A protein has these predicted regions:
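Catalytic cores of alpha/beta
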Residues: 106-111, 269, 329-344
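Structural detector of well-ordered beta-strand residues that form the stable sheet scaffold
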Residues: 96, 117, 140, 253-255, ...
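C-terminal accessory regions of radical SAM enzymes
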Residues: 2-22, 27, 41, 334-352, ...
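Short, solvent-exposed turn/loop segments enriched in Gly/Ser/Thr/Pro and often Arg
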Residues: 224-228, 258-259, 326-330, 354-363
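Acidic, low-complexity intrinsically disordered segments
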Residues: 1-212
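Hydrophobic/aromatic residues located in beta-strands of well-ordered beta-sheets
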Residues: 3, 50, 95, 219, ...
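Radical SAM [4Fe-4S] cluster-binding motif and immediate context
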Residues: 156-321, 341
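Glycine-enriched alpha-helix->loop->beta-strand junction motifs that scaffold or abut catalytic
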Residues: 113, 274-280, 346-349
Length: 429
């Protein structure tokens, strides 16, 4: 039997706002698909044949000889994902879907597919395959708990084998853990992966790094919450110790982290990360108390903490690639100036800017929908480049204008990026 996995395309920042290509002196960078499809492919029974289509590279809406079509998508790709589901069902193909949007809005997706997988996929996926082979698909499969330490490595070769001139990432994601005990207002992770922090073993992580290294790729550690103080730090420290001992300092490209995580992490661990080859932090902003308040003009303490977090990165010789989120309820017309001044004063060299987006399944979406402030359910617009709700102090037009100004003015004096090597002058926008 044969399954066709499909990763739907979505509108990127520079597609929504082509002027960004004029503002930013970098190459637009197409990153790897998320790990969902690769994780399911890894647990497929041996008698199943696999095919993968990345709709970002070539139009996936074409006939297939597969027995089953499986789509995985997050909110920004949901409009296209549902279009593709309709296409394959019209071709007479049983079609199923999973991913973050499906987990958040299963009833919406069920209008377009034969079956959905809600939540963490591997266990439910195997049950779905058993039912399909027996001729009796259920409409809905809920998460079945799995032991992470027993899972095989995601089959990222599906992605790497599809590389070409327009798609050749320098790195691919590697997970150290799943789940998160926090409840950030705009994050779906506790819903999709539960609030329990569960870890892979060090040997599993090292095996994934070695597989990528054999393909000439590095790992980016951005798909989990491993920098949470305590247990997660211990696994990270063990990984860094391994990389240093093995002389594999070029294995990890960058690591996802937040300002509170930086502030709570001992400087010795940051120095160890640098010795292990970590040269850049992807500094996620807008979800935590520091970055939600630092640029409001009303909280000097959080602004000071933000400066300390950036200074701590520089102290460890790790570049803070900083993500700024604009358009939240506490933001006003002066927030853009305050963000730009902070970036200048703190010495940030590389940044990205996004519009606050209340994703389905998050506390923010539920609250704003209850307040009648969601202004669009056109899911393709939920890509961090459009204002899809009504902020308290700004109009949607002001949010868009401020977002574009952030990109334009931050990169106005950074033409030197044009002369940098490939991995130094690429940015996903």
């Amino acid at each position: 039997m044969k399954v066709l996995f499909v990763y739907p395309r979505f509108q990127r920042h520079a597609q929504a706002h082509p002027e960004l290509l004029e503002y930013v002196p970098m190459n637009e960078y197409l990153g790897s698909p998320s790990l969902g499809i690769a994780a399911l492919a890894a647990v497929m029974p041996a008698h199943w044949e696999l095919e993968f289509r990345d709709d970002r590279l070539t139009d996936a809406a074409r006939p297939t000889d597969a027995d089953l079509v499986a789509l995985s998508f997050f909110t920004a790709a949901a409009t296209r994902g549902l279009e593709l589901a309709d296409f394959f069902r019209a071709q007479g193909k049983p079609t199923v879907a999973g991913g973050l949007f499906t987990t958040a809005m299963p009833d919406v997706v069920l209008q377009h597919v034969d079956s959905v997988v809600v939540g963490e996929g591997e266990g439910a996926w195997l049950k779905l395959l058993q039912d399909f082979e027996a001729g009796g698909l259920q409409r809905r499969y809920e998460r079945i708990p799995v032991d992470l330490t027993a899972l095989p490595a995601p089959k990222v070769s599906l992605y790497i084998d599809g590389e070409g001139p327009s798609f050749h990432p320098d790195d691919y994601p590697v997970q150290l853990s799943r789940g998160c005990p926090l409840n950030c207002h705009s994050c779906i992770l506790p819903v999709s992966m539960t609030k329990q922090l569960r870890e892979f073993t060090l040997s599993q992580v090292v095996a994934q790094l070695d597989q990528l290294g054999a393909k000439g790729k590095r790992a980016c550690l951005t798909e989990d919450t491993s920098w949470l103080p305590g247990k997660g730090n211990r696994l990270l420290e063990s990984l860094f110790d391994h990389l240093i001992a093995q002389g594999k300092e070029a294995t990890v490209s960058y690591v996802g982290i937040s300002m509170p995580m930086i502030l709570s992490t001992p400087i010795a661990l940051l120095h160890k990360a640098r010795r292990a080859g970590v040269t850049m932090f992807y500094l996620v902003g807008g979800f935590d108390p520091v970055t939600m308040r630092a640029f409001t003009g009303k909280d000097e303490r959080q602004l000071e903490r933000a400066h300390k977090a950036i200074a701590k990165c520089f102290e460890a010789d790790i570049e803070p690639y900083t993500s700024f989120l604009y358009g939240q309820d506490d933001d006003d017309v002066g927030t853009v100036d305050r963000m730009l001044e902070f970036a200048r004063a703190s010495g940030i060299r590389k940044a990205e800017f996004a519009i606050f987006t209340p994703y389905p399944g998050t506390p923010s979406f539920a609250r704003l929908e209850a307040e009648g402030r969601i202004t669009s359910r056109e899911w393709r617009r939920y890509n961090d480049a459009n204002c899809v709700y009504q902020p308290k102090q700004l109009t949607a037009e002001q949010v868009t204008e401020g977002y574009l100004r952030l990109w334009r003015e931050f990169y106005a004096d950074k033409s030197y990026f044009q002369d940098r090597c490939h991995d130094e002058r690429t940015i996903q926008f």
